[in-house]
Amino acid sequence: MLNQKLNPTPSEDLTIDVDLFYETDPCELKLDEMIEAEPEPEMIEGLPASDALTPADRYLELFEHVQSTKLFPDSKTFPDCAPKMDPLDILIRYRKVRRHRDFDLRRFVENHFWLPETLSSEYVSNPENSLKEHIDQLWPILTREPQDHIPWSSLLALPQSYIVPGGRFSETYYWDSYFTMLGLAESGREDLLKCMADNFAWMIENYGHIPNGNRTYYLSRSQPPVFALMVELFEEDGVRGARRYLDHLKMEYAFWMDGAESLALNQAYRHVVRMPDGSLLNRYWDDRDTPRDESWLEDVETAKHSGRPPNEVYRDLRAGAASGWDYSSRWLRDAGRLASIRTTQFIPIDLNAFLYKLESAIANISALKGERDTEALFRQKASDRRAAVNHYLWDDENGCYRDYDWRREEMALFSAASIVPLYVGMANHEQADRLANVVRSRLLTPGGIMATEYETGEQWDKPNGWAPLQWMAIQGFKRYGDDMLGDEIAHNWLKTVNHFYQEHHKLIEKYHISGGTPREGGGGEYPLQDGFGWTNGVVRRLIGLYGEP
């Protein structure tokens, strides 16, 4: 189970000192009930008894030793290693030999683990291939089969084939996959769409939610809930009928709304926040408050410089990863200082728009099945959420949606996340028109739209542009009749990706688009990744709509 712990042998030489100088934020002391507003969530039910341990829990002090000494340049490498024998035997062997004078940690790891495979060279195209041909030829390279799973690895077995993003990401990711699916549909790969539909439904059935990705260390959180959008895509492309997924949609909704009924005003539990007027809105959350397995050392270092209890920082870092925007000024109290992260204190506009879509989808499919009471219930939930979003997250003075800091009771930053309400049909036409003006003046560039207008060094900020944001902006504005802006973003983005492709013969995770010639996007915790799943998916779909750039 997720919370299972073993007692490691004490190890003075592996201790990491953390100097704590706790800061006091007066705004966070305003109400006594806020101090106890977040009871510890119960353990997630329904996880399989075997192979659900994270590498950190399974290898204990060996894991800390490897990560704290930075044995691998990328902290994700060791959690993705697969053991060559029973993990308990490996741990016992480690405890026997680790204090020997000639102990070699690297040799020990290489003798006992299979290292992750690197396939980066395969993402580079034949220069003679068109952009469309390059993407279509990448799908087999990015496909993983169920039989590739090794016992006791952190990789969670899935029943069907799936697409990975590429680079360091050798597993499937929840919200990435939706944007990848757009391209699969355009490429005529209904076979892979069906496989991925079955996989995500299977994860909901077995885990009660769709994890961040199919790794044990991702089970404690999800990602932006886009399964309702996937179901809509399956229906549109004739892959699977929407009716078969009604129960899965309800299960996902229950995961996101767990604990809502028992919340008092100004209280939060897991993903749900009860606002001062009694309305319910959601935030990102992770059930663990330890360093992320895949970014262990980075998280420990960030917590060191935060001036807050480490477990609070770890929770906010994990919640930031659950948002898909890891990381961004959206979650920071002090722009440019990751240690100031407060993800769990923000009500995100994109998350609540996606949940509005989920509520609407449940209502619509229930109507198709003749379940009138369920339809009425979820239409009301969607209506209530839209009203709450308009009350707390719509900035009428500036004509845009913004995240909301529920602790401080004030609006937070404006970002490209504000276009998600348009993508899911949550806004009215006046809001869409006003938002278009703000996006034009603050986010639009000759290369597409930037994630934010703030340059912080984080990857989900200026100057970077990301494929999913372009797609939702293009379709969102066109949905409300602003074809001119939608088309401009589409042409700008296709020009960006094609320019880079013509020079480097590959697609990448993100692009620097704030001015001048488009180039590789930077920032964040890891090097730029090639591949790249959702870039391929969005660009392939846009080529189908607009032709080759």
Swiss-Prot record:
Reactions mediated catalytically: alpha,alpha-trehalose + H2O = alpha-D-glucose + beta-D-glucose
Pfam families per record: Trehalase (PF01204)
Stored InterPro entries: 6-hairpin_glycosidase_sf (IPR008928), 6hp_glycosidase-like_sf (IPR012341), Cyt_trehalase (IPR023715), Glyco_hydro_37 (IPR001661), Glyco_hydro_37_CS (IPR018232)
Subcellular location: Cytoplasm
Main localization (coarse): cytoplasm
GO BP, sorted A to Z: cellular hyperosmotic response; trehalose catabolic process
Entry-linked SUPFAM superfamilies: Six-hairpin glycosidases
EC class (word): hydrolase
PROSITE patterns: TREHALASE_1 (PS00927), TREHALASE_2 (PS00928)
Active site location: D326 (proton donor/acceptor), E509 (proton donor/acceptor)
Binding site for substrate: R168, W175, D176, N212, R221, S222, Q223, R292, D293, E294, G324, E525
Keywords tagged on the record: Cytoplasm, Glycosidase, Hydrolase
GO terms under cellular component: cytoplasm
EC number: 3.2.1.28
Top-rank lineage group of the source organism: Bacteria
Cysteine pairings via disulfide bonds: none
Coiled-coil intervals: none
Reported function: Hydrolyzes trehalose to glucose. Could be involved, in cells returning to low osmolarity conditions, in the utilization of the accumulated cytoplasmic trehalose, which was synthesized in response to high osmolarity.
Quaternary state and interactors: Monomer.
Family indicated by similarity: Belongs to the glycosyl hydrolase 37 family.
NCBIfam families the record matches: PRK13270.1, PRK13271.1
This protein's name: Cytoplasmic trehalase
Provenance organism: Salmonella typhi
